[in-house]
Amino acid sequence: MNIRQWFKIPTPKYSAKVIFKWLWRAWRGNQLQAILNAAIGLLSVVVSLAQVWAVQHAIDVASGHTEGSIYWSVGVMALLVLCGFALRICSIWVRNILGIKAQNRMQQRMLDRILRSEWTGKESHHSGDVLNRLEQDVGTVVSFLTETIPNTISVVAMFVGAFLYLFSMDKVLAFVIVGIIPVFVLLSKLYIGQMRRLTRQVRDSDSKVQSVLQETIQHRMLIKTLESDSVMVDRLESTQSELRHRVVKRTAFSVVSNFILNAGFSVGYLIAFLWAALRMADQTLTFGGMTAFLQLVNRIQGPARDLTRLAPVFVGVFTAAERLMELEENPLEEQGDPIPLTAPCGVRLEHISYAYDDGDSNVIEQLNFDFYPGSCTAVLGETGAGKTTLIRLILALLHPNDGKVILYNQQEQKELSPLMRCNFVYVPQGNTLMSGTIRDNLRLGKLNATEEEIKTALEMSCASFVMELPDGLDTVCTEAGGGLSEGQAQRISIARALLRNRPIMLFDEATSALDPETERQLLHNILSNHDKTVIFITHKPAVVDYCDQTLHLQKQ
């Protein structure tokens, strides 16, 4: 049984080599801040060692062991102190200003990667967990790449410089002080493995807490109507208890490890102090020399202690990198220029079958249907019959296990791919408005839409009420369209779809909250354009009456 098995340390999901390659790619996007931090750190090392020499020289001049001007010595010390202040100010500026830019850049890259990846039909991570990773783990990785690595270079430089300085004063003690360090390096491998496991547990528990908080706030109205306030608070307490237990366990392990480490360094410092005192008693070391002696020992032990403290930092960044790499596991969708087709367009399903990864049977099996150009089709079926799955297949969000989805017009036909999504506009069921003004929401359909185009889309979607609001298009919607009724939010969503103006329109229960008269007027407006191919997922007879054909899906 090896050490990993003895201490029940699990095999990590990714090897250290794979994680280092991922971190290297991430570092290349943050080189400027890393290089500046490293340069400032190395200059700080030079200033710090120069201060040791300046203090020794000033004390020896004051005690008469060395000739020179005490005013000149103090002046040099003051200059070095000012240099240290200036370097610290530069370090703070680089860390704060460039640091937030680096973090923003990585968050943007990760979000872009998530949005361009294939969707498997079911999310593998809770949205609260994803947010936790994009906020906390990205911050950990950026801090490591732009601060920890440059600081490590400075620490190593300080260690080497202080050792050489001490070696020039006393060779034996220099080797004694440095000789105990490999012992801690050998112990660090076991420490890192155990701490990595504990840190991963803490981060996962932290994600669970954020997920509970997010869901509770998101569904606050439902929770109040179900009178489940105490249930959700108890659920939060349960996840927090798990987090607290794991934090206590990790902290206890860290405290014991740090105690052993600090005890070793304290013994080393006492040995150095005793050695220097004996040399002073023999008059082979001046008081200034002893001061420099002890300062150098601190400057050797300090970097050595900092290097050992890097172990939990490495653990944290390895854990954060693993969690971010998991977000990149889904393959990217096909990338390239959009492929628009001239309207009117149709969609033809040829022997389509689809089953989700965790499903025992096909949701859709051997389906053939033609949504011909300019048609209006109602898709009907009981819950679980595959209506929403069909929409996802038509939008190329999912890919059929068997068969083909063909997009065609009078001139050409092509097998559907994500690059053809530009030919569709989709209005999902429920409230799909986002935080911001009504104008912001509408321009998600067409970024450069003019005021006239927006007003026309609102009229077509029976949403002219927007212009009668006190702030009109600049009325602010809170999260999920807060401040508007369900019917108002649906009509604004339809107006957004009309602004997008694509040849094929898909509506998933998009008129469910509308009264019959408004629904009739809206359907009449939508179907007045004969170049559009319209597909309704619906249960409402009033919608079916407006359609040219129907598709009945049967539950498999």
Briefly describe each language-model feature range.
Residues M1-S48, S63-V76, S91-R95, G99, ...:
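Membrane-integrated ABC transporters
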Residues W24-Q31, W119-T120, Q136-L145, I149, ...:
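An intracellular "coupling" helix at the cytosolic face of ABC transporter transmembrane type-1 domains
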Residues L32-L87, F167-V172, Q283-F287, Q410:
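Transmembrane helix-loop-helix hairpins at lipid-water interfaces of multipass membrane proteins
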Residues A39, L43, V47-Q51, E67, ...:
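Hydrophobic alpha-helical transmembrane segments of ABC transporter permease domains
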Residues S228, A252, L296-L327:
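Cytosolic ends of transmembrane helices, especially the final helix of ABC transmembrane type-1 domains
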Residues T389, V425, G430, I438-N441, ...:
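ABC-family ATPase nucleotide-binding domain "signature/switch" substructure
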Residues L395:
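Helix-to-loop junction immediately C-terminal to a conserved catalytic motif
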Residues N431-V476:
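Conserved "ABC signature" C-loop
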